[in-house]
Amino acid sequence: MEFENQKFLVILITPMVLVLALDDFYVEEEFVINDKKLLRLVIEHIKEKGQIQKRKTQMPLIIHNTRYVLRHIKKYT
C-alpha cells in the first residue's frame, strides 16, 4: 500500500501497538513496536509535529500523523 500521499491517523491502542487508520476506517496497517525508546521518540515527534486529540469513543488517543512517523516505524520494524 502506498502511504506517501495519504493522510493517516495513528491510534495508540496499547503502549506497544500503533494502528494506522484512514478516514476513520481502520485497520489499514498495524505496527507493533518492541523498543520502548523508539516508541517514545515516535510519540514525542508526533507531539511536536502533529496534533493529539483525546477521544471518548473506542480508541482513547488519536494522533494525527506525519509521513515521517510512517517511515520511522517501517525502518525499525
From Swiss-Prot:
GO terms under cellular component: cyanelle
Keywords: Cyanelle, Plastid
Record-given protein name: Uncharacterized 9.4 kDa protein in trpG-ccsA intergenic region
Localisation per UniProt entry: Plastid, Cyanelle
Organism domain of life: Eukaryota
